Amino acid sequence: MAGTTSTNQYLVIFTLCIACLLGSLHFYEVFPLTLGFQGRWVGVILEGQLGNQLWGMASSHGIARARDANWCWVDTTGRWATYQHYIQWLTSAPRQCENDGWANVILWVFSPYHFISDNGNFAKYQDIFVSSSKPRILMKGMLQSYKFFNPDLPIPFKLRAASMARRWVGVRNITVAIHIRRGDKLWDIGNVAPPLSYYNLAISMLTQLFPQDPQTFVIVTDDPGWVQAQSEFSGMHTLMSEDPSFDMAVIAACKHKIISIGTFGWWGAFLGDTGDNRTSAVIYPTLQMQWPKASGFDNSDYFPQHWTGIDYALEN
């Protein structure tokens, strides 16, 4: 009986080893991190919705480029279906680093990884992501700083809706996009949704900066009801389509951008940024976060220097 028990135990162990080996063989084809395989890699765990996903892609790609490393996305939580939902809007995106299942066991137990988290500093540049001496690093966090990548170099994706959005903007002769984000930002503690006074100030500033430019506006928003209730926005186009990537591409297609809080507006502005504030403007609210989120946010790491910030008073 004892011999049979021992044999069964060995059989279970042998079966587990074979399963691990089979998983690692497929895993090696797409992400050679396990069991000491050679190569420099940067893997990123993407989080959030479209804007946050773009931050993770751009920043991790920039870090991989700085480290002369390969780059991919790691599925450690089985969110592949969610990720596919977002990449359908992009012309290209990082490949999946690994298969789930036994490959995950191999990854976490045997791989000589340097796991780095932003530790709540979601919008602050941290050199540790770039300077790690390990050949393979796995990053987790929002990575919301343009300093992680070179804004002057091409980012590794484009919005599929970009051409359609340019046509949409051109037919209507729109020159200014206003992004108004409210929704969850009204109740999520630490976020500061800009009041109406901010948008009035931004429009006035834009007129002062470019007095000769005709101003035809489109408002891209998640709260069209609130927009329609404001007389200041009367006569402006309002857009909230079923395709967030199209809405983002419309912001990018406009010459000037007035953005709100959140990563969605940031990427809409950045993807259409000329880099020259003498010919076009990106205007943003300087007050983005309050306690408890303010400690993880740095305006100078988040907003490019040539963008224009506006200070405003919060309305009661």
Can you describe what each PLM-predicted range is?
Residues 33-48:
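Nucleotide-activated donor-dependent transferases that construct or modify glycoconjugates
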